[in-house]
Amino acid sequence: MNHIKLIDCPIDVTYAINLISDPSCGASSIFIGTTRDSFQGKKVVSLAYEAYENMALKEMDKICSDLRATWPDLKHILIYHRLGTVPENEASVVIAASAPHRSAALKAVTFAIDQLKSRVPIWKKEIYEGNHDAEWKENSESIRPKKSLSSFNYSVCKVDESRVVSRNLVQIRANDCELKNRVECFFKRKRAEINSCNVIDFKQSNLSSNINSDTEVDVSCARTQSTISKQEQSNCHLKVRRATNRCGPQQMQFRPEYKHELSRLTASRVSTNEVGESLQNSRLHSIETYMGLTSKNNENIINRIKNVENRILLLESTSPEYQHFFEQSCMDQPEKKIKTNKTYSAHELRVYIHRKNKECP
Amino acid sequence: MVFVNMNTSRPVSVDIHVLFFAKCRELSQTTRSVFTVPSEIRASDLLDKIVIQFGLTTIRHNLIIAHNESFVENLNDSIFLKDGDELAVIPPLSGG
């Protein structure tokens, strides 16, 4: 059973222990919080407690539920808290728990007092001897204002109203998660760009000037996996026996033609599926149009999907910094279609109808 | 013909009960008060309004709020208020 109370009179500890004791329990654990008689050299005369009572009881009940969820063995739980004026050295809070074994009882009480100090809306004011001002205390564990869960700092990218914004940029509403994702994609893209530049730089910096540009790729030692072993009776200490480049710019020319391979593999399957093809085609075509891509209908469907995917990845990782992508793309096409939302007055309409009537009597 | 756009809902104002405890109660010199606010508002904006209205600026950075007896854990959250809702201004706790 849960015993929860906010009380105005002294807490009877013996009574509390009796409440939670049970024949089936080998352990009862009790915590008694008492008021101290001094704070920073000032003598405490008394303490005044106040609570947001309904909510405090609710939160205390929640603590009980949490305790039972964590230690299902618990038999009885008691949380009593004093309100009003409490003279020094009296119990202000009593927490007790009983369980078949001591571990659950002891841990539950510790957890409960920590939770109570952080979440139950009760406040304590210390009243001191002499001329010292009374003071509202603050638990270090107390729940504090949290504001920073929204990780995106909107203030760092203020919108410059004066600038003419490209028509291709639209304002979107997105939650933090989406924004974070977009920023991460942008980082990734940037990283990839920098990486590819680095590879090229590395290649060039290793080139001596007398090697002509045709052999450049072959002699580059970027991304090399080599096995080195000493030869018998060799004048040299070390000799390269084998070098394998599994990836890297030197291997570009050896890569299989993925596009070609794909077309070859899927050609037969696509042609047999002619009934569904027109529907697929029209849907894919509308997606392509929407994304500003052009393709021939007879082009391999896998390639077209791949292009769409690439486009999505590009757009996802694109920020205003990448405006040049828009400029070279064909996204400007639908310009003509945009309607002007001109409103006509009744008079204008009448004039228009009149004119039309005249034109075709 | 006249078209009325039903979607552009203007923010509706609601009357809520604001409760003050401990130091907040002393600074605001009241235990509860009726306060008119928009029905949808970010918790931090609501807290700012209350802080200004009730003279709590000295402790504003330590305050949290509880809406209908539940803590609003994150002040960036939007809260949706109805007439008669209870909003408690909660300074740092010191129970135990």
Curated annotation (Swiss-Prot), chain A:
Pfam families: MoaE
Subcellular location as annotated: Cytoplasm
Gene Ontology cellular component terms for the protein in this record: cytosol; molybdopterin synthase complex
Gene encoding the protein: Mocs2B
Source species: Drosophila pseudoobscura pseudoobscura
Single Gene Ontology MF annotation: molybdopterin synthase activity
Principal location listed in the UniProt entry: cytoplasm
The protein's name in its UniProt record: Molybdopterin synthase catalytic subunit
Reaction catalysis annotation: 2 [molybdopterin-synthase sulfur-carrier protein]-C-terminal-Gly-aminoethanethioate + cyclic pyranopterin phosphate + H2O = molybdopterin + 2 [molybdopterin-synthase sulfur-carrier protein]-C-terminal Gly-Gly + 2 H(+)
